[in-house]
């Protein structure tokens, strides 16, 4: 962890050089970039040309003879048309070339990055990165890079040329005035630079805070069942709010600072106008300048200076892109220690399959303080089966990781056929090894595709044979789409047994020489296990096999059994040899497992029902993203973390039909009234902000008025000129100061209102989501912008428009109407321009969603990808998913280019029309010189003001949409609402549970009937064990008692009261749930145990609970003891260790009802005995419901109930049920007997 944080801190200074960004450009890109740059330079010069023409125009209007004037104006107006055509062409080329090349190059970088990530060694994933980071970089960082090397480069070139051109013209036309005005430029630049610098710092802080808040969301949603079962909703909400508070403070500070920056800039600009007017007048009087010349210089310097000010978005983008590229380019350059793409290394004709580990020393890169092997040796002769047994955490699975060469040993050798693994070509040797692990990883694609990972271009016949051999054909044929069924993210749509059989089929298809089985049958119930075991026996013949197993029954037949203890082999031999030595380690393990002879039947482990996302020890999969595991109603919309710029929100990938619904939902328009209502507490703040916004809004039209007055003034006689120039200069300064005060005030108040709103909405949403019956939610990315900034804009724009219109119509109503008719074009033009300044990249992100899903799946299952050498397969799939978005990006580039070009075309044509009609009006005496300019400036500046501010606004449609989705969340009342305080509570709970005629289907799989009219009574203080086949609905019983779901019909009663009438949070506090896949939070062991107790637990209680769960000893032996962080999803602990912590958490709650869902299935014999003892102690005097595979756990139950086809087929004690000949229970038991 420490390394990570230090990396974050120095991340700020690491950037690549600007030109390095383009290192992946090909020839086409170079051509596009060259054309784009030339066009951009050309486009940059249009504005300086425009000021020249404008100067001529003013002089034309300044002539006294009306007829002569009209002729002169016409001459100049034609030049506007030429300019319009020219600018249209260059603007199109500039934008389209740069956008297209940006899209192309970023696609290349994305592909290369994924390719490099897939080739990294597994250790890299343990220590350097995680899925979230990879996906974040692929979806977020590449967009920053694309932004820095696409349209922004063109824009920057354009602005730079405008700056240079403007100054060249100014110095050519009037060097004295230009020199004086230049002195103002540094001030403008400094203000702008300081603002963007501070802003980016603040934005960084805000993002960190939001990222942390996003993390809280991710963890909570990921573990929603655990949160809910332990009524941890309030804790989660509090933690979330504390993170939001930090983010809120930065939002307000950002508002204030951006306000000051903008205010200062505008103040400086207005003051320099004042200076220019006064000094210009002086030059006209003393140096013989004319009015056109002065105006020309003023405009040229200002366009030049303004364009320099507008470069900041580009410069920010360059900085962000260079920083983002640093990490990605580093990764692309990184050559892994163990490289799957490295084709050097020998390839043999064939291998025999002798495996040897020679004096191996090893530690996991992520836990360098724990030595796993110190001088470990093992030999596996070819064609033989060696089984590794031993306690949880002893290093059995590590042997498999070393043979697959996921890691290299620190010293010692791993040999195959006496050749060091390091000398063999990695891809080739992995193709000879088949791996079936305890937690089979499936990709979010079809069953057929999943199996085909085993072999390039496998035929349908081969796939068919593989599924038949793996005993998967039966269940696949039952599925509506057969082999084309989608398996869901990480295989969530399949039960454990089904997933495992697919994984085995995948290995069979590969037809490997060496087979590695890591707990391959631990997830199966008796029947599937026997079937799969047969399949594996078929698979194992004539292959070298290494088996890791908890269950000794599965390995009795192995040629050699090796007992691993604390990283050493303490005993090895065949089952029969070792069982002779009663004191030997093996015999002790066997005794532990059996308890007594007839219990050797214990491999009774019906697998949990359809709904379970399995995992024993999660050490292997640090899959960061996962759907809300277990049959949650959202198992389809798996949560993905999009580290969205504003809000690392949780984004939901729905299936198609969901998306259609989504769209319908989205069109529900949100009234601003409703949003405003949420903002009610901030009304005073909003009023102050609005007043400031109104004042700020009047500034632009007044500025137009001043411009025209001052132009008029330049043509007045010297005496009046002198007096007027002083007056107008002061007015400009006053205007500047107004801005300086009003903008920060406006931004600050709206920042507070907006920030509070977003904080309120986020915490409301989060609170709502946590209390949802396990449901999806959307991100609140842009919600703040709607009230905060959008309201400020609306007020400011209204003020701008009204003032502008008043000035124009009082000046000259005829011309005002003509210009007004054209002003929509000006608005469109300004909007388009500013939009290009802010960029288009947000859309790219959504388009690459599907491609990111492919990457996400591959990275979170990197071991599977590596062991099946499927890197190229993944890359092909990825490229395929990228094609659409890439083409789209190119299309977008061309369209935007055209739009940009035409917007310029319109602008210059409108100017032309305006002045020609003005000249006409003057000729017929309907207007004066001053009026023409008054109207023109008031309206054009009004239009520009409106359009720029609107475009800078975060897209309010987006904001409206997200508002709609937020209100959907806030309006949705969950059917099962844990936040509601309604419902009864009992003084004391006895713990009688009854299911009365319950029928049920999962909301997400309405075609599968789980319970039909199920009846079951569980007397208080007794233990009831549920057994049955995989998918029969045993775990569902537990989900229904916890009230994760309501029955479709029938009732569930506790102490004769229907559970739907109880207060939900109280009900859940009465129960302790320990599930098969314990979910821990990424915090310390201490806080994970304390999670069980609402209102906090004392240190003594925590230690007592840990002792009762047999966890105290191993916790104390860890370097940091109770302060050890368990890692994401508990990856730093072994399965048995996690399970004991989960039990301690349940014990601390001291529940009346104990629900054990496969609580010991993930443990090895010794931990199981220890944990089982702990459970036996806890079960006393509590009503206990146990779902289990193993007979030992079940035999002592007071009642055993067999769940079959959605009803209870039999119930009674073990002895009674055994007597029913041909009974369901007896046959389940016989199955086991024969399996042994």
UniProtKB/Swiss-Prot annotation:
Glycans are attached at residues 542, 631, 653, 1082, 1181. It is found in: Membrane. It is a multi-pass membrane protein. It comes from the Eukaryota. One of its GO terms (cellular component) is cytosol. One of its GO terms (molecular function) is ATP binding. This is ABC transporter B family member 9. The gene is ABCB9. Keywords: ATP-binding, Glycoprotein, Membrane, Nucleotide-binding, Repeat, Transmembrane, Transmembrane helix, Transport. Belongs to the ABC transporter superfamily. ABCB family. Multidrug resistance exporter (TC 3.A.1.201) subfamily. The chain crosses the membrane at residues 38-58, 80-100, 158-178, 179-199, 257-277, 288-308, 685-705, 725-745, 785-805, 806-826, 902-922, 927-947. InterPro entries: AAA+_ATPase, ABC1_TM_dom, ABC1_TM_sf, ABC_transporter-like_ATP-bd, ABC_transporter-like_CS, P-loop_NTPase, Type_1_exporter. Residues 355-591, 993-1230 form the ABC transporter domain. It holds the Pfam family ABC_tran. Residues 594-616 have a biased composition (Basic and acidic residues).
